[in-house]
C-alpha cells in the first residue's frame, strides 16, 4: 500500500513552537516540496529491506526451490572438465532427474504395498530400478547404487 501524502498545517499560531528537528525537515512556507522519486511497488533497493509483504504486514519468506543443478554441474566437471552447460540444458537435466526419481519412488511404493511392508528399503529401490530402467542401464545403475550404499554404511 502506498504511503499517504503529508498534510500541511493550515495556519501557524505564534504561541505554538515546533522542535528544531521538525523545522529542519519541512520546506519553507512559500515553496512546494519536491516530489520524491518512487520505485514501483515491491522493487526497493537491494539492501533497503523493503520487499513483498503479506496481509499482516510481515515480510514474506522466499520459498526455496530445491534442484539438482549443483550436482549435475559437479558430475559434468568430473566427466568433462572443459565443457560448460547452458541454463536451458541444465533445466532439462533437472526435469529429467525429477522424472526418473518420481518413477522410481512410485514403483518402489507399489512394491512395498504388494509385499505389505510399511518401509521402502534399498531392496525395493533396487527392484524398481530393474523394472523402470532398460537393460544395460539398469545393470550399471544397480552396481553404482550398491557401491554407494556400501560406502555409506562403512563410513
Swiss-Prot record:
Region (Disordered): 1-63
Post-translational modification note: Can be acetylated to form H2BK6ac and H2BK33ac.
Location of this chain's protein in the cell: Nucleus; Chromosome
GO molecular function per UniProt: DNA binding; protein heterodimerization activity; structural constituent of chromatin
Disulphide-bridged cysteine pairs: none
GO CC terms of this entry: nucleosome; nucleus
Annotated Basic and acidic residues bias: 1-28, 36-54
Keyword entries, A-Z: Acetylation, Chromosome, DNA-binding, Isopeptide bond, Nucleosome core, Nucleus, Ubl conjugation
Primary location: nucleus
Modified residues annotated as N6-acetyllysine in this record: 7, 37
Gene3D superfamilies linked: Histone, subunit A (1.10.20.10)
InterPro entries registered for this protein in UniProt: Histone-fold, Histone_H2A/H2B/H3, Histone_H2B, HISTONE_H2B_site
Cross-link (Glycyl lysine isopeptide (Lys-Gly) (interchain with G-Cter in ubiquitin)): 151
Pfam families: Histone (PF00125)
PROSITE patterns noted in UniProt: HISTONE_H2B
Family note: Belongs to the histone H2B family.
Function: Core component of nucleosome. Nucleosomes wrap and compact DNA into chromatin, limiting DNA accessibility to the cellular machineries which require DNA as a template. Histones thereby play a central role in transcription regulation, DNA repair, DNA replication and chromosomal stability. DNA accessibility is regulated via a complex set of post-translational modifications of histones, also called histone code, and nucleosome remodeling.
PANTHER family per UniProt: HISTONE H2B
Subunit structure comment from the entry: The nucleosome is a histone octamer containing two molecules each of H2A, H2B, H3 and H4 assembled in one H3-H4 heterotetramer and two H2A-H2B heterodimers. The octamer wraps approximately 147 bp of DNA.
Protein name stated in the entry: Histone H2B.5
Organism field: Oryza sativa subsp. indica
Underlying gene: H2B.5
Amino acid at each position: 500500500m502506498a504511503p499517504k501524502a503529508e498534510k500541511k498545517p493550515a495556519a501557524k499560531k505564534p504561541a505554538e513552537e515546533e522542535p528544531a528537528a521538525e523545522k529542519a525537515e519541512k520546506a519553507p512556507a512559500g515553496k512546494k516540496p519536491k516530489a520524491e522519486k518512487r520505485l514501483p511497488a515491491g522493487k526497493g533497493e537491494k539492501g533497503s529491506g523493503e520487499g513483498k509483504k503479506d496481509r499482516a504486514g510481515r515480510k514474506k519468506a522466499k520459498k526455496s526451490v530445491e534442484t539438482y543443478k549443483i550436482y549435475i554441474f559437479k558430475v559434468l566437471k568430473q566427466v568433462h572438465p572443459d565443457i560448460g552447460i547452458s541454463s536451458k540444458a541444465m533445466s532439462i537435466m533437472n526435469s529429467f532427474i525429477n522424472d526418473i526419481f518420481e518413477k522410481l519412488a512410485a514403483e518402489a511404493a507399489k512394491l512395498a504395498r504388494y509385499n505389505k511392508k510399511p518401509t521402502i528399503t534399498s531392496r525395493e529401490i533396487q527392484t524398481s530400478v530393474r523394472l523402470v530402467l532398460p537393460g544395460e542401464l539398469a545393470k550399471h545403475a544397480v552396481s553404482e547404487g550398491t557401491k554407494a550404499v556400501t560406502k555409506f554404511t562403512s563410513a
